[in-house]
Structures are given as C-alpha cells and as structure tokens.
C-alpha cells in the first residue's frame, strides 16, 4: 500500500531529509511504504544578489536506497487535482479537458455510457481541478463550451438545442451535466465565506489579505445573477429549461426522480439509436417542421392536416399516425397487466360495462384479488402547460360515477371497488398520483418499466410518421431513387 498526497516542507535539504526519515518510519510501523518512483522533490533556491529562483537538479533525497526524482523548471507535480511547479500553482488549462472529451467520443462505448463518462467522471474531475485562484472566467466558459459540444456530438443534438437542456438537473428535465462556469465560482465563494465567518479569529483574518479580498470580490462579480449557491444555480437552470422550447412541461416530474432513471440506466432492449432518440424526445428535439427556427409558413404538417407540425401534434394528434399512439397505449396497458398478473391479480382488459341507461364503458384494466376490485384506465398525454394531475383526476372522475360503480358491483357483488388511473407523459414523465396504483397493486419496481415502454412507443410513433410522410412525398420511391 502507498500513502498518497503527502507533502513535506522544510527550509533546507537537511531538514527535509529528517522529515522524510520520520515519515518513512511512521508509515513503516503501520504497514505502509513510500514509493520513491511515484514521488517528486522540488528544491528551490534564490540566486544571490538577484530576485531570481533556481532549482536543484541533483538528487538529494532517498527512500529505501532509491532516489526521489528532482523536478526541473519545466516539470510539475499533481496534488489534489491541481498542478504545481517551482513558481507555484500552474494556471488551469482546458487542453486536458479537450483531450479527455475526445477520448470519450472516440471510445467504443454506447451513447448512454459516453454520457455517463462525461457527466460523472470527466466533468466531475475538472470540477475539482479548476478550483484555483489562478482560474480565469475565459477558461471556465471554454470548458463549458467544450463539454456542450461533446455532448451534442455524442447524442446527435443539433446546435440549436438549448444549453439549459444539457445543464439542468435530471429531476428538472435536463441531462444533469453541471456548468463549470456557474458552479466553480459559487463553490469557491462559499468556501471563502465560511472561512471569513468561522469562530476562529485567526482563520477569519484570511480575507483581510489584499490578494484574497481581491479574489473574493472577483468571485462576487462572477456569481452575480445566478443566486451564488449551487442550489440556486440548479434551480436557475431548471427555470431556463422550463421557459425554453425544449423544456415546457418537463418540470412536472421533478418531485420524483423516476422520470429520468432511464438516462443513467437505459433498458437492455434499447439500441444506441433508441437511447439517442429518447434523449431527443425528452428534450422536444426530434426533427419536425414546427421548430421555432422555421418560417411560420413552413411549419405546417406535411401530412396535410393544416396544423403546426410540432412534436406534440405528431405524437398525439396527427391522423397520419393514428394507430401508432393507440398501439403505444395498448403496449403500456399490456405491460401493466403483465406486472399485475405476476403479483397474483386476475386482470381483464377492456371489460364491457353496460350501464343502466344503455351506454357502454370499457376501462382498460379491471383487476381482482381477494375482496378488492381495482379499475384502472391508462392515458398518455403531452407534457405541456396543463399538469398531468388534471388528466389523472379526469380519468378517475369518469369511472367513479355512480352508474359505473353500480355496473361493477353487479359484476363483482360484495367486493370493494377502487378507481385509479395511470397517466404518463408522452416524453416519459411520471405523474405522482400514479403511485396510488403501484402501491395498491404492490408494484414497487413497475415505474421504470412502464416509462420505458411509453418512451419506446413515442419513438416508434415519430419514426413511423417520418417514414410514412417520406413515402407519401416520394411516391413510394427509396432515397437512392430521388
């Protein structure tokens, strides 16, 4: 075993050797050892009569008979993610970030794995490396720009996709990649503020040092407009996403993290193309004519239905894909049935309930177990200005009318009836009221499966729309015949 990140300071090489001997003995007694080849020595002196520094290149320090390499003026060593040379801390650079992002892009990984590498490893590493008094605002902006460029390449997002979709938290509907430009100044500002307000009077005087005070004022300028704390920064990115073309309605799932679980753990049956389309679906970025950058006269649906070809229109109301949203609905309802049957529920789909006035009701699922009857209707709506809870309460109210309950009691006499609904957003948003159905049926892990099937169904609807509209426009000819 080796002890990492240990630095010994001394006024001369003799004192340094004594410290090195003490450290070697200390670790030896605890079963540890210093590794000379992974260590570095930096010996700096002042040229007599001149204000110039020089470095010793002769080996002055040894561990176990092995010399510790001496650093030259061109060398540096790493400590806690930062680089140091004989003149102090090296100014942070984004070149290493650029190199690591390029490696991730070219790696033989799936898009979901690449996104995880960027979010949880590359960006997280530089969150520490760039926390330096020598960091510049330009370096932070360049770092964010490189990260966004890499994410857009990995996920095939167009240049017009909003930055907020990349930086907003997953719970708020984004991809959860933190903004280094926003977070690093806020983190350093918070740390200096804690030092200034500490109970230790000696530590609190640090901010009275002119250089530290100047840097603190710089951080105050850099954090203007974003709340100054990481919590407020995340909320601000969520607000920007909600106000954008991509994020409208996605915040409805922010009380539960289940709506974005697939971003980190996509289902096994998804291909890389499925994952990319799911990300673009979530951000309202699948190709349509109704995007704001198109002139108004070019936004009409290519199916000829005289409506704006928005993604919500394609997925929910276009006659060209009439049957595919129905199949998506049936797929989600069928999946809920499969899960319920595994838990011992007797399930009947689209039970025909004839009411006293002769009208007919056909709830999607009627489930029976013991003395309990659960009536559940499934609906998939667009995440827009209207909350998903509105659709939920409408469904429950529709099947909670007394004539409907009477028809159910006639079919199942002596049993208690519970009317519930399953409401999903077309982009994979989970309505919190759905927890009533999963709790009643004891389906603790059903949410992810239902959401994934809904997303996959929406992807199929869009693909069929693009295929059918292209076939119509070309008269059935293939792309190579045009």
Swiss-Prot record:
Residues 208-482 are annotated as: Nucleic acid-binding endonuclease. Keywords: Endonuclease, Hydrolase, Nuclease, Nucleotidyltransferase, RNA-directed DNA polymerase, Transferase, Transposable element. The keyword Oxidoreductase does not apply. It catalyses: DNA(n) + a 2'-deoxyribonucleoside 5'-triphosphate = DNA(n+1) + diphosphate. GO terms for molecular function: endonuclease activity; RNA-directed DNA polymerase activity. The keyword Nuclease applies. Transmembrane segments: none annotated. This is Retrovirus-related Pol polyprotein from type-1 retrotransposable element R2. It comes from Popillia japonica (Japanese beetle).
